Amino acid sequence: MVFFPHRHLIGIKGLTETDITYLLDKADEAVKISRQREKKTSTLRGLTQINLFFEASTRTQSSFELAGKRLGADVMNMSVGNSSVKKGETLIDTAMTLNAMHPDVLVVRHASAGAAALLSQKVACAVINAGDGQHEHPTQALLDALTIRRAKGKLSRIIVAICGDVLHSRVARSNILLLNAMGARVRVVAPATLLPSGIADMSVEVFHDMKEGLKDADVVMMLRLQRERMAGSFVPSIREYFHFYGLDAEKLKAAKEDALVMHPGPMNRGVEIASDVADGPQSVIESQVEMGVAVRMAVMESLLISDNNGPRSEGVGA
């Protein structure tokens, strides 16, 4: 019997409340390991992890690398800039090449939505989505949930305000799916130009005014203004954006006194968040980074190891 019934982690969509709770509970155990003097275990000894990042990443890639090493895996970071991809090799060709090397888990980040799902159909190993276009970023949502649960003691019946560039954010999508699954009350706060069509169908409350959206919120989750994904003029100016939608001390007063301030990083200080708030007593941004390693340890162990501490067989779950 395998406790976690999925072979891959492509998105939050498809995970049950039980699945999510299982991963968060296992991540809690990983936090303890990460805080020990001796952090390395032999859980994934003899297994190979390949990190395949087609988009630049510091936090996510280093977090996955550290998670794999703490579990005892052999970790390889594939540099796309120096790979055959730059010479015209397709994603599928790359997948077939890597599959021939018999890795046990492939961690992939790609600019195209659906890239991780496509790879999972072409390789024999487990696939973890580290972000695919504007689609999903499941481990970010899990680490955010773990951060909230450890601080608040629960996820159900809390108010979470997700603020900023929702349109271009895979982080927002995954968080909305997870928080709804766990019984939280989710709000999105953004100008109309930075909201996707059909946002109201995602079981969220929509606000265009920060103070209204933050009223009595337990958690304020800021999103990076993703200028690299913008093809048009979504905001009049950075200065005006910060004036209306940047989180400063005055706007934060609308939330509960003990509200958590979160940001997935990297932050644009003075754009979506003021420095005194990012570095203030309500900020749990550094805790999010710590929880990221623990969550990724939990995900890899859950995908690769069965309940009797042996490697999982091929083709388990979906």
Curated annotation (Swiss-Prot):
One CC-aspect GO term: cytosol
* PROSITE patterns per the UniProt record, alphabetical: CARBAMOYLTRANSFERASE (PS00097)
Q: What GO molecular function annotation could you give as one example from this UniProt entry?
A: amino acid binding
Reaction(s) this enzyme catalyzes, per UniProt = carbamoyl phosphate + L-aspartate = N-carbamoyl-L-aspartate + phosphate + H(+)
Catalytic activity, EC: 2.1.3.2
Q: Which InterPro entries match?
A: Asp/Orn_carbamoyltranf_P-bd (IPR006132), Asp/Orn_carbamoylTrfase (IPR006130), Asp/Orn_carbamoylTrfase_sf (IPR036901), Asp_carbamoyltransf (IPR002082), Asp_carbamoyltransf_Asp/Orn-bd (IPR006131)
In this chain, L-aspartate is annotated as bound at K87, R170, R224
* Highest taxon listed in the record's lineage: Bacteria
Pfam families per the UniProt record, alphabetical: OTCace (PF00185), OTCace_N (PF02729)
Instruction: Name which cysteines form disulfide bonds.
Output: none
Q: Which GO terms describe its biological process?
A: 'de novo' pyrimidine nucleobase biosynthetic process; 'de novo' UMP biosynthetic process; amino acid metabolic process
Instruction: Give the record's keywords alphabetically.
Output: Pyrimidine biosynthesis, Transferase
UniProt-annotated binding residues for carbamoyl phosphate: R59, T60, R109, H137, Q140, G265, P266
Pathway listed for it?
Answer: Pyrimidine metabolism; UMP biosynthesis via de novo pathway; (S)-dihydroorotate from bicarbonate: step 2/3
Q: What does this protein do?
A: Catalyzes the condensation of carbamoyl phosphate and aspartate to form carbamoyl aspartate and inorganic phosphate, the committed step in the de novo pyrimidine nucleotide biosynthesis pathway.
UniProt record similarity statement:
Belongs to the aspartate/ornithine carbamoyltransferase superfamily. ATCase family.
Question: Self-association or partners: how does it assemble?
Answer: Heterododecamer (2C3:3R2) of six catalytic PyrB chains organized as two trimers (C3), and six regulatory PyrI chains organized as three dimers (R2).
Which PANTHER family does the record associate with it? ASPARTATE CARBAMOYLTRANSFERASE, ORNITHINE CARBAMOYLTRANSFERASE, MITOCHONDRIAL
- Entry protein name: Aspartate carbamoyltransferase catalytic subunit
Organism per entry: Allorhizobium ampelinum (strain ATCC BAA-846 / DSM 112012 / S4) (Agrobacterium vitis (strain S4))
